[in-house]
């Protein structure tokens, strides 16, 4: 990280030359407040006001404090929703998550194309070359950011596929699970034993009419006031495993 930070730093008195940076904008203040309120339910006190560096340190401390605890994945999920997405650009704004003013992807075990761009430009500049064409490299940065998202989506879909494939012969089996997501159309549940995730559709929650509280990640019943919220322990039964759609359907077990 130190090398990656130093490579992108502009010496005093020097005009910055074109270079691809790894940038990460400040998080959405409203979403940070939602994160603060959510984590308070688990006993965490997170300060979401102050300087950019202070907020980053507070969030990193939160990740350390919840590590290994049952609510870790839930808190990480809510925290990620508050974060902006990191991307590549020649227009440096710093990297919030790392609390760096300058950061670039300089090296990795598996070579990324942005690393190669940086290597080529450094060689060019060390040999006295002029600053590269800004529009050309910004277009390349945008393309790399887009392809990174494509790769991440492919990774997620492949994981879903293997989950459904694994659970295909377990229809009807009952597992301990916890609620890993709440939406207006149902409950996501993650099986404690194997971490496979599926959905209990809203249509199967037929004991009441449930309203979705998006801010607090809760479903509340209108008549009986029963509620489902992130982290709740539940028992599920595997209902369907649709490999084509990469989708697991659960029902609540009695």
PLM segments and residue spans:
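Append "with occasional cross-activation on large, charged helical scaffolds in nucleic-acid assemblies
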Residues: 1-192, 199-201, 206, 210-217, ...
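OB-fold/S1-family single-stranded nucleic acid-binding modules
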Residues: 226-254
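A conserved acidic, glycine/proline-rich C-terminal tail/linker
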Residues: 218-225
